[in-house]
UniProtKB/Swiss-Prot annotation:
Keywords: DNA-binding, Metal-binding, Nucleus, Repeat, Transcription, Transcription regulation, Zinc, Zinc-finger. One of its GO terms (biological process) is regulation of transcription by RNA polymerase II. It is found in: Nucleus. The lineage of its organism: Eukaryota, Metazoa, Chordata, Craniata, Vertebrata. GO terms for molecular function: DNA-binding transcription factor activity, RNA polymerase II-specific; RNA polymerase II cis-regulatory region sequence-specific DNA binding; zinc ion binding. Changing residue 29 to E: In a breast cancer sample; somatic mutation. May be involved in transcriptional regulation. It comes from Homo sapiens. This is Zinc finger protein 569. Gene3D superfamilies: 6.10.140.140, Classic Zinc Finger (3.30.160.60). It comes from the Eukaryota.
């Protein structure tokens, strides 16, 4: 049969099997066939032959059975469908040979018919396996095609021989065959890695040289391998042909779908030999193993920081360059890594694919699910070497370590104040910008932090989720519960070095120290009065604004402070939680109990500088001093009369209003003063 001089196609080097023939191949023979066919296809692609990917290659890539109908095999080879070799092919042959000489990898010269003979070592040409004449011709044709189109040693088939090549490479048995063949005759001079083809070696060398000859025409991204460029193009074309049956998510590659499905099945086939921790992806296992070895082969040239993963180094380098090539189409925010963009996109879509099988809570990131699950398991794998305290998150341990080292890496550019926590730094910056993005729907009050708004809203709802196990008392804030529990334990870990006074709360201790230093850093812009605490300034400002955000739901009376509302509520409930140990008398306020106790002890800590008279209450001393100074700060708006005490003004005002709030239960007579009622009631008792 004469050879036609036409363009070489993939069919020159292709072998077809019928279903019956394919079944007779053992696993080793099938594997070899797959490798050879894919290799020949890649060789033609590499030297620039343009053609559509054949069906058989699709099948081999998807690991499907590549056999064809017997009629198709007959038609191809008995209808003269044979291709010759043109000048272009001969030039490519010469080019390949030059490349091999360049790398000084010379194998023993073998003829095409010898290749056919070696190939028969794995595919024995017996009457059982090759019942028809066209099959014999197929293998004969294959040998000739190799002889014409590729150097014999450029094909895996021709490497199967019992004798060694001149490099004395190690050999191994393949399948059940007693034949041996060379695996990697072409060595990389940089890292020593071996390859069975020169073209594979050429592609590998691009890792060392950084060469990326394949560029995307859409985004100019370059790749070292043509296959990677083809896969990349699918991102632009949105071609996602592999869909998950569980959640409907689609993928460009079948391998990505297989990895994704492990999220649903929970399969983790890759286990660490050191600690037996298992992973759903092999790459994650490889990264994990570096924790045990301590290996960090990837070092940053800018700052010297080392990483166990190459991808982590690449991501880190963008910190120095400021490069953020991945932009969100929704809001324009840019990211240094495509993975970060993918996670960010879920904030727009609301996608939360990772669900907790304990409580049903869903998360947008797998790492967040892992952290959440530790709430259920109680696992705290990150332990402090200094104090032994354990944490469920690595970031929490990092922040905790700063309490030992004193490190405060976050510094405010406005006031130079430094913080150990990033979130505290961000919150602090809002003081300078006066930004209060979180507003209460009930009263319109705005807050710097979301957590402050949540706590504030409990005033309106009355929610008190934190309950004391000792006495059952409930609190709206966890910090208040912790402080309260110290009353039961008697713990006062914070002691003043000046006077020895101890406190159960750190904040109270800090406030107390300002008594000794006299520090009052918080000034009122209205009247200039200074305060030692910002909370005290906030409360004081309400005296200027008249703001009373805390309203009693029983009588509608409003208060400027939550604590005042709580005290007022006891007038409705009759609650008197503070009991005197001496006489059993109960009080609604703690301060009232303290003042009462002085009646038993005789303590009078407040002394007048003018006359030396002492008082059990600070307010009594204040009123007494006005007797010396003549100060009368409380004026009647009706007649202008002034009083030294507000209680005296209140009584006086009843003369103008006619108010008589004190009623006799015996006769119903009313009085403007309580003392008058008491005097009147004696009439009924005598």
């Amino acid at each position: 049969m004469t050879e036609s001089q036409g363009t070489v196609t993939f069919k020159d080097v292709a072998i077809d099997f019928t279903q019956e023939e394919w079944k007779r191949l053992d696993p080793a023979q099938r594997k070899l066939y797959r490798n050879v066919m894919l290799e020949n296809y890649n060789n033609l692609i590499t030297v620039g032959y343009p053609f559509t990917k054949p069906d058989v290659i699709f099948k081999l890539e998807q690991e499907e059975e590549p056999w064809v109908m017997e009629e198709e095999v007959l038609r191809r080879h008995w209808q003269g469908e044979i291709w010759g070799v043109d000048e272009h092919q001969k030039n490519q042959d010469r080019l390949l040979r030059q490349v091999e000489v360049k790398f000084q990898k010379t194998l023993t010269e073998e003829k095409g018919n010898e290749c056919q003979k070696k190939f028969a070592n794995v595919f024995p040409l017996n009457s059982d396996f090759f019942p028809s004449r066209h099959n014999l011709y197929e293998y004969d044709l294959f040998g000739k095609c190799l002889e014409h189109n590729f150097d014999c040693h450029n094909n895996v088939k021709c490497l199967m021989r019992k004798e060694h090549c001149e490099y004395n490479e190690p050999v191994k048995s393949y399948g059940n065959s007693s034949s041996h063949f060379v695996i990697t005759p072409f060595k990389c001079n940089h890292c020593g890695k071996g390859f069975n083809q020169t073209l594979d070696l050429i592609r590998h060398l691009r890792i060392h040289t950084g060469e990326k000859p394949y560029e995307c025409s859409n985004c100019r991204k370059a790749f070292s391998h043509k296959e990677k460029l083809i896969k990349h193009y699918k991102i632009h074309s949105r071609e996602q042909s592999y869909k998950c049956n569980e959640c409907g998510k689609a993928f460009i590659k079948m391998s990505n779908l297989i990895r994704h499905q492990r999220i649903h099945t929970g399969e983790k086939p890759y286990a660490c030999k050191e600690c037996e921790k298992s992973f759903s992806q092999k790459s994650n296992l490889i990264d994990h193993e570096k924790i045990h070895t301590g290996e960090k082969p990837y070092e940053c040239n800018e700052c010297g920081k080392a990483f166990s993963q190459k991808q982590s180094l690449i991501a880190h380098q963008k910190v120095h360059t400021g490069e953020k090539p991945y932009a969100c189409n929704e809001c324009g925010k840019a990211f240094p890594r495509i993975a970060s963009l993918a996670l960010h996109m879920r904030s727009h879509t609301g996608e939360k694919p990772y669900k907790c099988d304990k409580c049903g809570k869903a998360f947008s990131q797998f790492s967040m699910l892992i952290i959440h699950v530790r709430i259920h398991t109680g696992e705290k794998p990150y332990e402090c070497n200094e104090c032994g305290k354990a944490f469920s998150q690595s970031s929490a341990l990092t922040v905790h370590m700063r309490s030992h080292t004193g490190e405060k890496p976050y510094e405010c550019k406005e006031c130079r104040k430094a913080f150990s926590h990033k979130k505290n730094f961000i919150t602090h910056q809002k003081i300078h910008t006066r930004e209060k993005p979180y507003e209460c729907n009930e009263c319109g009050k705005a807050f710097i932090q979301m957590s402050n708004l949540v706590r504030h809203q409990r005033i309106h709802t009355g929610e008190k989720p934190y309950i004391c196990k000792e006495c059952g008392k409930a609190f709206s804030q966890k910090s208040n519960l912790i402080a309260h529990e110290k009353i039961h334990s008697g713990e006062k870990p914070y002691e003043c070095n000046e006077c020895g006074k101890a406190f159960s709360q750190k904040q109270n201790f800090i406030t107390h120290q300002k008594v000794h230093t006299g520090e009052k850093p918080y000034d009122c812009n209205e009247c200039g009065k200074a305060f030692s605490q910002i909370a005290s300034l906030t409360l004081h400002l309400r005296s200027h604004t008249g703001e009373k955000p805390y309203e009693c739901d029983k009588c509608g009376k409003a208060f400027s402070q939550c604590s005042l509302l709580n005290l007022h509520m006891r007038s409705h409930t009759g609650e008197k939680p503070y009991v005197c140990n001496e006489c059993g008398k109960a009080f609604s306020q703690r301060t009232s109990l303290i003042v009462h106790m002085r009646g038993h002890t005789g303590e009078k800590p407040y002394e007048c500088n003018k006359c030396g008279k002492a008082f059990s209450q600070s307010s009594s001393l204040t009123i007494h001093i006005r007797g010396h100074t003549g100060e009368k700060p409380f004026d009647c708006s009706k007649c202008g009369k002034a009083f030294s005490q507000i209680s005296s003004l209140t009584l006086h005002m009843r003369k103008h209003t006619g108010e008589k709030p004190y009623h006799c239960i015996e006769c119903g007579k009313a009085f403007s003063q309580k003392s008058h009622l008491v005097r009147h009631q004696r009439i009924h008792t005598h």
